Design a protein with these regions (language model features):
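Extended hydrophobic leader/signal-anchor segments used for secretion and membrane insertion
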Residues: 1-435
Length: 435
């Protein structure tokens, strides 16, 4: 038997696909799926059932229909890509500048679900190639809802990882403004005012909008932000290359040259020059860029834009209490909840854990209050953007539950700048760049 005959043999094909299928079932951990071997056996060996019922059977010499061939190819592509999206990789586009210098607005990524293990779909009835919306309507049905379960991956979330996750506050959204934080609007405007803004949608965990941030604290860590810098368990965090902050830049009355600004990697259209300062009230800079700006001949002074008055931000900064004394730059210390750990519930720490108990762990708050303690059902993480003064992150909405973790950015396959025209809009230097 030649190699070509061996590869084309029906038993060879059956054994190959059967072994792959069994490996997938073992990974999935649900052995009821082994009954699928009957289907594979029939496809390649017995051929009793016409599984590709949509495909026309042609008589010898009959001309093949191009439409039928295209339909066959499309059905295969939909099944194959959906399988890849669920278990291996998923495309994701960076929507904001919160990770600027590390990940840019307009970066198109492949997110590896194998990094931490893929989640088994909790909302399986979903239109292929959509996440949560199509034409302004839900692209999924909640008729079938599964419990959270994660398959084994290559590892676990580590401190410093860039992580894609479901937005924790995205369980409730306004249909007309799905990108807005509904819970923040309720705190600031009041529930009655928000109710007047239109219909709300309740989304399952796996249908929340995706965010990407850097994991700065793991379950069991104690986090504190002092003068904008993160400290974990008393140790200052690693200074990542893309880390940047907002600075107040005072000049001698002359603007910084546009070419100099562009050379720094800053879009001049995003800078505001205040003649009364004179200078720039908010310039976003990395430590390297900061040194270059300070060295410019027309720059007199550069100072940090720290938020120091907690009274001004109590409705914006987690845990949204008047007496926390926290701002985006002076935050904590805060202990990150860990699965299986029991904490005593007090009047002081209840605002920290109330949403965990009711929304993420789906437990009974009154029962926990009566017991005076609570045991966490899953791990939690603290995420922050590298653009620390232009990032809505865990400082503004709290902890990220483990069941919200989607994966880790793996590859930038395309990057475009919306502020430029094609072909200059394509950032070629970021093409096929590993994250």
């Amino acid at each position: 038997m030649s190699l070509k005959e061996f590869i084309g043999n029906k038993w060879t094909k059956f054994i190959f696909w059967a072994l792959l299928y069994v490996a997938w079932v073992i990974w999935l951990g649900n052995f009821w799926w082994l009954f699928g071997l009957i289907v594979i056996f029939d496809i390649y060996i017995t051929r009793k059932v016409r599984w590709n019922f949509w495909k026309k059977r042609y008589k010898e010499g009959e001309k093949h229909s191009a439409w039928n061939e295209w339909l066959d190819a499309i059905i295969f592509a939909v099944i194959f890509v959906t399988f890849i999206n669920i278990f291996f990789f998923q495309a994701f586009k960076i929507p904001s500048s919160s990770m600027e210098r590390t990940l840019y607005t307009g970066d198109h990524l492949f997110v590896s679900k194998l990094a931490y293990g893929p989640r088994v779909p909790q909302t399986p009835l979903t239109i292929p190639f959509t996440h949560n919306q199509i034409f302004g309507k839900e692209s999924y049905s909640t008729l079938i809802q599964k419990d959270y379960r994660r398959l084994k991956g290559f590892g676990h979330v580590k401190r410093g990882d860039c992580v894609v996750f479901g937005f924790p506050n995205g369980d409730t959204v306004l249909r007309k403004a799905p990108a807005e934080d509904y819970h923040a609007l309720v705190r600031i405007l009041g529930r009655d005012k928000v109710a007047s803004l239109g219909e709300t949608i309740v989304r399952p965990v796996d249908k929340k909008d995706h965010y990407v941030k850097r994991c700065v604290a793991l379950p069991g860590d104690t986090l504190e932000v002092k003068e904008g810098l993160v400290w974990i368990n008393g140790v200052r965090e690693e200074q990542y290359p893309g880390l940047q902050f907002s600075y107040r830049v005072v000049t001698n009355g002359q603007k910084i040259n546009t070419k100099t600004i562009e050379k720094l990697g800053i879009n001049p259209s995003e800078l505001y020059y205040d003649p009364s300062l004179p200078g720039y009230p908010a310039m976003i800079l990395t430590s390297e860029m900061l040194g270059e700006v300070k060295a410019l001949p027309n720059v007199i002074e550069v100072s940090d834009n720290f938020e120091t008055d907690p009274a001004l931000y109590c409705k914006e900064i987690f845990p949204f209490t008047d007496n926390s004394g926290w701002t985006r730059d002076f935050f904590g210390p805060l202990w990150i909840p860990q699965k299986g750990v029991t904490v005593k519930l007090t009047e002081e720490n209840l605002p920290l854990y109330e949403r965990i108990i009711t929304a993420y762990d789906n437990s009974d708050l009154q029962q926990a209050l009566q017991a005076g303690e609570y045991t966490f059902k899953q791990d939690y993480y603290f995420m922050m953007g590298d653009n620390r003064h232009n990032s809505l992150d865990s400082r503004y909405w709290g902890f990220v539950p483990e069941d919200h973790i989607v994966g880790r950015p793996a590859l930038i396959w395309l990057s475009t700048d919306a502020g430029r025209r094609f072909p200059n809009s394509i950032r070629w230097r970021r093409f096929l760049k590993f994250v």
